Amino acid sequence: MDQAEFEKIIEHTRKSRKYRELILPEETLQDMLTAEAALGGSKAEVIQRFRKKLHNVIAPYLENIDYAQETERMKACFQVNPTPDQVKAWALSVMQKHASTRERLPNIEAFCQCLHGHISTPDRILDLACALDPLLLPWLDFPNETEFLAYDIHQPRVDFLNAFFARAYPSAHAIQQDILVNPPAQPADCAFFFKEAHRFEKRSPGCNRSFFQALP
């Protein structure tokens, strides 16, 4: 397939009913389609493999969270100058809607205490493939000057997190970036990579070692 065909497939995928609300990075689709095309076969076979791999990798993002609605709920919460406990209650209500994040909620206090005990107060943290992990910040209680950079490929989620950061964590930023294709260039004292290595392996077997080595 030539580049024009690649672009047509990518554009069709981004606009499909299944994926359009995610606003996936073009670099993600280009990387996955290129990898499948390199394996050979007919155009139909390449597209079939691409769609299957894309579903396996992206399926966890196909959640039932209305991030525009959650942003409005968050704004309402912060309009009344909430207490720390009220912020935590709001964060829990959102994390409960995300399958992967929900699994750690019964142990959230112990998890955050253990995590904080290991990393103390780093100057900069990278949260790689963050999902809703940044909503743990009210429990981690880092200093205001701690820089927290959260990376995800789901644009509506990134926008939601940035709205949250703007109201509560001015040194935090969410970035839409495919970290496997384009690893973060910023050096950091600590990086979170929660429950994502297996999905990287599904996408590109054996990639985790080179990914970790690419981090500054």
Could you describe each region identified by the protein language model?
Residues 37-118:
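Conserved Class I S-adenosyl-L-methionine-dependent methyltransferase catalytic core
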Residues 132-144:
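Conserved SAM-binding loop of SAM-dependent methyltransferases across substrates and taxa
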Residues 147-152:
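Conserved SAM-binding motif I beta-strand of class I
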Residues 161-162:
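Conserved SAM-binding loop
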Residues 154-156:
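Conserved SAM/SAH-binding beta-strand->alpha-helix loop
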Residues 121-133:
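Conserved class I S-adenosyl-L-methionine
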Residues 169-180:
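Conserved SAM-binding strand-loop segment of SAM-dependent methyltransferases
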Residues 137, 188-204:
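A short SAM/SAH-binding and catalytic strip from SAM-dependent methyltransferases
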